[in-house]
A protein has these predicted regions:
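Short cysteine clusters
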Residues: 34, 38-41, 254, 259-261, ...
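Residue-level signal for mature regions of secreted extracellular proteins and peptides
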Residues: 27, 31-34, 254, 312-315
Length: 347
């Protein structure tokens, strides 16, 4: 188990300065492939994307988190290290998902905290029952079901209702999370409507449930709610986003993203253990990360504009500006070791 003092940045920070917190949870992006192509995707997942995290990588990531946060962590933080499995859509690779859970159980890694799905596969009640029972048997703590206007463009709401109903019968209600329950009770018809009607539902959903504008979300729907000038955004840096991140996301290729900052690679678990990456992380290790840490995305503007970036009048927020500039740098082939993989950007 690592201590706060094991990190390079923390060693140099003053006693009263904020410290770089130990990552205590990790999301395993099983794949970037998804049956849907949601407008608010934090990555750029779609049926055309790929990648599949190997069983070995998933187990190594799980072990690596336990080594970093440690079984001793609860005595200090009262927070157990947690793993959740997401995507893309994990249920596209059902047998592979089961194999990961089997190996985790065999290695006594404890339960997977959450498995996420959009419910596209819940076409038969018997199949749903069988799969939920298997997930329960292999130690899944909670099932998280996506339910919102964005997903319902691609997934029949009746399938989502069937999945939620069966899951709540077989598991305790607090082990089934529907995001968002409002749209399960009162679905929004997203098919056979005009573009204006669709955009109206998007905006209403974003008002009720704020979204982070990274990945595909920064390309389309962000424009619908863009209301902040660069001057307003410039006052906010990203130091807290890095220092206070509760965990990381690890993609199918081993790339590690801090918190929810998709497309900004801070390490690769295929090359170094998570504990070693955490212990050696400091903002000065990379130019882009150092700029974001100290000045936020507005700090990248001068370089981007000089290289040909066209600044918009308004942005939906700090993450929208950041993703827009990073997309420009990515298109230019700049900062290749940090900006990636391609599945987080538009080609």
């Amino acid at each position: 188990m690592s201590l706060l003092s094991d990190n390079i940045y923390n060693k140099q920070a003053g006693r009263d300065e904020p410290k770089f917190k130990i990552w205590r949870n990790a999301g395993l992006l099983l794949t970037y492939k998804c049956n849907a192509k949601c407008e608010f995707c934090y990555y750029n997942c779609s049926p055309q994307q790929g990648g599949l995290m190997s069983v070995d990588m998933a187990i190594n990531a799980w072990l690596s988190l336990k080594e970093l946060a440690g079984d001793g962590a609860p005595a200090v933080s009262k927070v157990e290290p947690k793993i959740h499995i997401t995507g893309g859509e994990p249920f596209l690779y059902w047998e592979h998902l089961l194999e990961i859970l089997q190996e985790a159980k065999k290695n006594n890694l404890g339960p997977v905290d959450t498995i996420e799905t959009n419910g596209f596969w819940a076409t038969d009640e018997k199949i749903v029952e069988e799969q939920i029972k298997l997930l329960d048997e292999f130690g899944m703590s909670r099932l998280k079901i996506s339910c919102d206007p964005f997903h319902q463009e691609y997934v029949d709401i009746e399938l989502v209702k069937q999945l939620a109903s069966v899951a709540k019968e077989l598991l305790e209600h607090d082990r089934v999370l529907v995001r968002w329950e409002k749209y399960l009770d009162k679905p929004v018809e997203m098919k056979n409507i005009t573009a204006d009607e669709r955009n109206k539902f998007y905006v209403e959903a974003l008002k009720d449930y704020p979204c982070r504008f990274t990945g595909r979300a920064a390309d389309g729907i962000a424009e619908l709610v863009a209301s902040q000038t660069v001057e307003q955004i410039a006052a906010r840096n990203c130091s807290n986003a890095f220092l206070d991140a509760k965990g990381v996301h690890i993609d199918p290729y081993g790339n590690i993203f801090s918190g929810t900052c998709s497309g900004i690679i801070i390490g690769n678990i295929a090359k170094r253990p998570l504990a070693e990456i955490w212990e050696n992380w400091q903002p000065s290790s990379d130019k882009i990360i150092e700029t974001l840490f100290n000045s936020g995305p507005a700090g990248l503007l001068d370089e981007a504009i000089e290289a040909g970036y066209t600044q918009s009048k308004l942005y939906a927020g700090k993450c929208h500006l950041c993703t827009s500039i990073r997309q420009f740098f990515f298109d230019k082939g700049l900062y290749k070791t940090v900006l990636g993989p391609a599945e987080c950007y538009f080609l």
